[in-house]
């Protein structure tokens, strides 16, 4: 039994912009689970299509019940191969990704097609499919459920990361993360408190000076 996912997303940027952002996605505030990316092969075909293969390393925190099934020294990083085919003439990009380790625990295969949105030529549509499978006897269903939930969570991060990079490339101010916003608010609160303290000291000093002047009179 294989868990299947089908989803569709829209980025409000042109295909050319999304294509450029695709190769510059990392790092971004939403991709902290992506540790490394390396291009291992690239070529242009006679019909002017760009073929690429990348190797990505991502963190892979297992659920506690899964950690009991594997030795403590099992790597918590996942190596992922990504093949992509870019057709600039038809403005399509197709990617295939799959993990090459931890395959006994779980295999996640993904296929994405990036194309011009049919309703708005200035937008880009992403059609995403994924297959989650496990060969672990007795717990394969639980592993697949976990894998599908993790995949959906990562899709959300991927889209937010895309939007962040697109905003930077287009010269807009990217939306700040909650951590950044909280940090700025904390710093601003400190500055406000410090300013209030200094003002209170100043007022106290002035009041003391006036009191002394009255006593002298």
From Swiss-Prot:
Span of domain PRELI/MSF1: 36-174
UniProt name for this protein: PRELI domain-containing protein 1, mitochondrial
Main subcellular location: mitochondrion
GO terms, biological process: apoptotic process; negative regulation of apoptotic process; negative regulation of mitochondrial membrane potential; negative regulation of release of cytochrome c from mitochondria; positive regulation of cellular respiration; positive regulation of endopeptidase activity; positive regulation of phospholipid transport; positive regulation of T cell apoptotic process
CC terms in the record's Gene Ontology section: mitochondrial intermembrane space; mitochondrion; nucleoplasm; protein-containing complex
Role this protein plays: Involved in the modulation of the mitochondrial apoptotic pathway by ensuring the accumulation of cardiolipin (CL) in mitochondrial membranes. In vitro, the TRIAP1:PRELID1 complex mediates the transfer of phosphatidic acid (PA) between liposomes and probably functions as a PA transporter across the mitochondrion intermembrane space to provide PA for CL synthesis in the inner membrane. Regulates the mitochondrial apoptotic pathway in primary Th cells. Regulates Th cell differentiation by down-regulating STAT6 thereby reducing IL-4-induced Th2 cell number.
One Pfam family recorded for the sequence: PRELI
Single Gene Ontology MF annotation: phosphatidic acid transfer activity
Lineage: Eukaryota, Metazoa, Chordata, Craniata, Vertebrata
Reaction catalysis annotation: a 1,2-diacyl-sn-glycero-3-phosphate(in) = a 1,2-diacyl-sn-glycero-3-phosphate(out)
InterPro entries linked: PRELI/MSF1_dom, Slowmo/Ups
Expression sites by tissue: Abundantly expressed in all tissues tested except testis with highest levels in thymus.
Subunit composition and interactions: Forms a complex with TRIAP1 in the mitochondrion intermembrane space. Interacts with OPA1 and AIFM1.
Keywords (A to Z) from UniProt: Apoptosis, Lipid transport, Mitochondrion, Transit peptide, Transport
Record localization: Mitochondrion; Mitochondrion intermembrane space
